[in-house]
Amino acid sequence: MRALGLVGLVGVANAVCPYMTGELGRRDTNPDATEATEEFLSEYYLDDTDSYLTTDVGGPIEDQQSLKAGARGSTLLEDFIFRQKIQRFDHERVPERAVHARGAGAHGVFTSYGDFSNITAASFLSAEGKETPVFVRFSTVAGSRGSSDLARDVHGFATRFYTDEGNFDIVGNNIPVFFIQDAIQFPDLIHAVKPKGDREIPQAATAHDAAWDFFSQQPSTLHTLLWAMAGHGIPRSFRHVDGFGVHTFRLVTEDGSTKLVKFHWKTLQGLASMVWEEAQQISGKNPDYMRQDLFESIEAGRYPEWELNVQIMDEEDQLRFGFDLFDPTKIVPEEYVPLTPLGKMTLNRNPRNYFAETEQVMFQPGHVVRGVDFTEDPLLQQGRLFSYLDTQLNRNGGPNFEQLPINQPRVAIHNNNRDGAGQMFIPLNPDAYSPNTLKGSTLKQANQTAGRGFFTAPDRTANGNLVRAKSSTFDDAWSQPRLFWNSLLPAEKQFVVNAIRFENANVKSDVVKNNVIVQLNRISNDLATRVAKAIGVDAPEPDNTYYHDNTTSNIGAFGHRLQSLAGLKIAVLASVDAEESFSAATALKAELSNDNLDVIVVAERFSNGVNQTYSASDAIQFDAVVVAPGAEKLFGAKSAANSSSTLYPAGRPLEILVDAFRFGKPVAALGSGSTAFDNAGINTAVEGVYVADAVDESFANNLEEGLTVFKFLDRFALDSDE
C-alpha cells in the first residue's frame, strides 16, 4: 500500500508533560490496583461460612419444609418463609442484554507506560507505572445469554477503567469496524440477524435469509462481514483476540489542543482462531468453551495480557486518507498511521459472583474522563451514547444502576441526582439544586480550569443545514472490503469463501443469493465467482469500479506466531496396558515444565497418571496431539469401525488424531506410536508432524515450535484456481 507522509505523528506521544496547569493537580496516590479492587468489592461480600440460614431481614430460619396444618395437611398462607423463598426465586432473572447477552468477565490492572500529557489530560495516562483497576467483559453479539461461545460472530471487548477521576469505558469489539454507519439503522441490523419472529430460530447465527438480505441491501455491512467470515469470527479463546474501539475519538490536552485517535488492544498471547468445523464441534460438545478457558487460565495464574495502542492523527486528517475518519466502517491502515503503545492490561482476578459482576456491569461509551472527547461519528453520537444508557432502565427497573458495586467509580460521587427505584445512598444535602447559596449545600462547578472537570474540545464546532442524509464521504462501501480481501493469505481467503458458501447454502431466496453475489462482485470477482459456483448462481462478469491491488498488514487471523504458549493443551494419547505410554508422558511434562502448558494424558479408563478418558475426549479440546508408544494398538485399521472396548466409541483414538491433523494442529508420535500415522493416512514429511524415538529436548522444541505456528495452513484444500 502506498505510504503517506506522516512526519510529526510518529512518536508524538512521549513522556514529556508540557501542560501542568490548573488549580487542582492530578491525584498522586497510586495504590496497588489489584488490592484496591479486592478492598472495594469486599465491602459488599456476603460470606456464609459457619453461619445459620436467615431471612433477607436477618432472622434465623429453616426452609426445607413448608408450614402445614398437620403433617399431611394444607400449606398455610402465613408461611412468610415459603413466600420469601419462592418470590425471590421467581424474580431472580432480569432482562438480558438486547445484544452481547452472552459474555464472560474478569478484573485486572492497567499500567501506563509513561506520561502522555502531551496528547491527553487523562489522569490514568499521566505517569509511567501508574496503575488503574479495570474490568473487561468479552461477549458474542447476536446470541441470547444461553447460546454458544462458538457462534460465528463479532465478539465484544468492553473495558472499564476505574480511574482516579471517574470511570472510563472503551466499549469495543474484536473487529475494528462495524456493520452500519448511522445508529438509526441499528434496530434493523439486529432484527435482521436475530432469530425469526415466528419460530425463534436460528439462534446465534446469520445463516438465514433475513441476515443476508440485510447484508446485500446495506453494503456498509460488507467490511465487518468479511472480518467475521474470516477467523476473527471464531477465535481460539477470548485470550487470543485483539480489541478495537471502532470509532475515532478525540484526546484533549490541558490547554485544549486535540488529536484524533483510534484505540487498539493487542493481545500479548498472540492472535489465534479456529476453523469452522472445529468451532461447530466444540459448540456441540462444550458451548462454554471460551468462558471456561478464560476462567481457568486466570485461576491457574496464567494471566492474559493486552497492550493498549492508539493511532494518533491530526484534526486536518479527517479526509486525508481517501475516506472519512468518522466512518465506523473504515480502518486506518497501519502503514498510514502506526500504532503508539500507551500501556499494558493484565487480567488477574475472576469474578466472585457472575450475576453481581459480569451480568450487572453496564458499559457506556459516554463514560469518558477529562482528556477524552467524542467525534462526529453518527454511530457514536446520540446513537450508542444514548442507547447504552437507555437500555439499563429496562434491565434494572430504574435509574440507579450506576450504584451497583461493579458499576460504582472508585472515587467519591457528588451530584444533585436523587431518589428513584433502588436508591442505595443517603444524600446529606437537603437542597439538591444548582446554583445554590445555602450553607453546606453548594456543589462547585468543575470545568477546564477549576476542579479538573471534564471539558469538550474547545475548537469543536457544529454548523450546516438540517438534513436527513448521508455524507458523500461515507459512500464507498467496497474499497476497504477489497483491501481486506487482498491482504489475506490464500488459506484465509478459502476460509472466507467457505464461510459465505455455508451461510448462503442455508438461504432459501434466490433473489437474496443473487443480491449477495452482486455485492461480493463489487469487492472481488474471484470471491463472487467462487461463492456463486457453490450456491447455484451464475458467475458474474467483473464489476471493477472499486477494484485495486492495495494490501495492508495485521489484517488476518492466521499466519501470526503465538507470543505465549501458556494454557495451551497437549493430549498424550496413551493406553493403560502400556507402561511406556506413561513414561513418555512423564518425560514430556518434564521437558515442557517451563512453558505453562497443560499436558493431558488420555487413556481408555482412569488409573494412576490418566487425566482424561477417550470417551470424554475429542481433538477439539487440544492444541496438539502426541501418540505415545504402546498406544498404537488402539489405532488399528479395524478400530475405525469397531471396538473391542466398551469404554469409548469405536474409532475414537484414531478420530482424535485424524481430526487434529485436519484442523491444522501439530501432531506427533513417539517410538512405536508412529505406526498410528499410517492408519490415519498422515504423511510424516509434512510441516507440523513430528516423530521421534523418545522424548528429548529436540522433540519438545519441535512441538513448541508447532504450537507457536498454531495452524498449519497448507493442510487445507484450496479451490483449484488458487
From Swiss-Prot:
Q: One MF term from GO for this chain?
A: catalase activity
What are its GO cellular component terms? cytosol; extracellular region
Cofactor names from the entry are: heme
The chemistry this enzyme catalyses reads: 2 H2O2 = O2 + 2 H2O
Where can this protein be found? Secreted
Q: What induces it?
A: By hydrogen peroxide, heat shock, paraquat, or uric acid catabolism but not by osmotic stress.
Is Heme one of the keywords UniProt gives this record?
A: yes
Short name of one Pfam family: Catalase
* Active-site residue numbers: 100, 173
Q: Where is the signal peptide?
A: 1-15
Its keywords, alphabetically, are: Heme, Hydrogen peroxide, Iron, Metal-binding, Oxidoreductase, Peroxidase, Secreted, Signal
Asked if the keyword Cell membrane belongs to this entry, the reply reads no
Chief localization: secreted
| UniProt-listed GO biological process terms | hydrogen peroxide catabolic process; response to oxidative stress
Query: What EC designation does it have?
Result: 1.11.1.6
Q: Can you tell me which residues bind heme?
A: 388
Q: What is stated as this protein's family in its record? A: Belongs to the catalase family.
Q: What does this protein do?
A: Occurs in almost all aerobically respiring organisms and serves to protect cells from the toxic effects of hydrogen peroxide.
Q: What is this protein called?
A: Catalase B
Q: Quote the gene name from the UniProt entry.
A: catB
